[in-house]
Amino acid sequence: MDATLLLNVEGIKKTILHGGTGDLPNFITGARVTFHFRTMKCDEERTVIDDSKQVGHPMHIIIGNMFKLEVWEILLTSMRVSEVAEFWCDTIHTGVYPILSRSLRQMAEGKDPTEWHVHTCGLANMFAYHTLGYEDLDELQKEPQPLIFIIELLQVEAPSQYQRETWNLNNQEKMQAVPILHGEGNRLFKLGRYEEASNKYQEAIVCLRNLQTKEKPWEVQWLKLEKMINTLILNYCQCLLKKEEYYEVLEHTSDILRHHPGIVKAYYVRARAHAEVWNEAEAKADLEKVLELEPSMRKAVQRELRLLENRLEEKREEERLRCRNMLG
């Protein structure tokens, strides 16, 4: 059936291939919609561009969350659960599809750790590319054309029925999520689950970074958020130390100290990372700085210096043995 009149949107035609069940779902703002889709050209062969079933994962979008391909929200909100429909969409609705497709393909290839959901922030950077890395998508980008979408609506969940990801929270919810994520990260760290703990800290950092972009740099609220971010980054670095990712620790701690040279914990954590990669002078310099800024940490510093000396002695002994074996 021609759904242009039903949808009241120019450049869309709908044909129902399989009827859905029940009434039209309540597509309220924040609802999560799960569906399979196949995208095809309007040529004689109906060339398939993308197919979520081939990837093995359905797609998710959040209603009202500025999804980049806005037409999909229009299409989905015309459907019932279990309905399968074919939509012909004119060029005015499909110009951005190549950029969306690129992101989805990269996810399917394991280049992005997230699931099949894409939001505006993730797509904005795509405009910087001259090529999308896929010939068929480059052609579509150069010469936009009408596309056919076959969509199967699987599920519609109200905001209270699923765990919302942090990028999908509003500002107040992000702020409320931070101490929860921080506490969960601490709990997981104590249990020795360092990978999971680092993920929680990262999530909290992303929330705060997002909030910080809305503040004027170096003003009171910005600095308050910056302090919280640095605390979380240093917790994240503690996880990296446990995972033996020492060079990343050096990168993060040095970045903090470039902007905030008085943070004692940053020197201490960086000293431990330097020690692990045999940067003796740098480790000792950082530990001296810790003592200068926080004399009460003398015992901890002395312990780290002993550990460093023991490790250096072990290394020197290994080198002596290696030389003997080479000469022997």
UniProtKB/Swiss-Prot annotation:
Keyword Chloroplast appears in the UniProt entry: no
GO molecular function: farnesylated protein binding; peptidyl-prolyl cis-trans isomerase activity
Annotated TPR repeat ranges: 178-211, 230-263, 264-297
Record localization: Cytoplasm; Nucleus
Top-rank taxon, per record: Eukaryota
SMART domains: TPR
UniProt key word Repeat: yes
One GO BP annotation of this record: regulation of opsin-mediated signaling pathway
Keywords attached to this entry: Cytoplasm, Nucleus, Repeat, TPR repeat
Pfam families referenced in this protein's UniProt entry, alphabetically: PPIase_AIP
Entry's Gene Ontology cellular component terms: cytosol; nuclear speck; photoreceptor inner segment
Domain PPIase FKBP-type: 53-145
Summary of subunit composition and partner proteins: Directly interacts with NUB1.
Described purpose of this protein according to its UniProt entry: May be important in protein trafficking and/or protein folding and stabilization.
Classification via PANTHER family: ARYL HYDROCARBON RECEPTOR INTERACTING PROTEIN RELATED, ARYL-HYDROCARBON-INTERACTING PROTEIN-LIKE 1
Protein name: Aryl-hydrocarbon-interacting protein-like 1
Origin species: Bos taurus (Bovine)
Lineage: Eukaryota, Metazoa, Chordata, Craniata, Vertebrata
Annotated gene: AIPL1
